[in-house]
Amino acid sequence: YPALEYAHLPLVLGPDKKRLSKRHAATSLEEYKDMGYLDSAILNSLARLGWSGGDKEVFYMDDLLKDFNIKDVQKAGAIFDITKLDWLNAQHLANLSLEGFKEHIKPFAHKIDIDINDHPNTDLLIASMRTFENTLYDIARALRPYFMDVGEYDKNAIDKFLSNGTKVLEDIHELLQTISHWNEEEIDVMLKEYQASNNLKV
């Protein structure tokens, strides 16, 4: 029989450069899936451990089959960074079609008793919230208030937090009229600038 071909892969280390363990982060891939990370983002993150694809950061399986070369994998330990996985997952989520995103968010919404179709403007709501967090689980949690029946209001809380609300809404309404390109990025920049200039807390 011909000799087997094999290669050594670098150890996966935590941010402290010690061997990755549960005290650093989850060590089971299933745990990451349960937390709302896409399979493609997890694969992307694993492939990038110890391997550089140049300036390109986001890879899918087809990209890896074409670009990955075991000879380019470094020998030194590779550091796993959860913030990088968060970023990659956000990119993969953003690249999903709206229908694809809805299919992926459904099981996470179901876990917290939400039926995403039980809303008069489901597509608009999902489209506006899909980049709000980095994982499907966190996005589902962020959607929850939109599916809750509001009971009694706390008047003291209203007086405390919404006393200036009308002016803020009027200001933002005027600023929205000045946006030249109506897209999420420009709206987000405008809101953050207004928040900073008026010392508003989220």
What is each stretch, according to the model?
Residues 32-40, 75-81, 115-125, 195-202:
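Structural motif
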Residues 1-92:
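Alpha-helical recognition segments enriched in aromatics with Gly/Pro capping
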Residues 98-200:
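Small-residue-rich helix-loop
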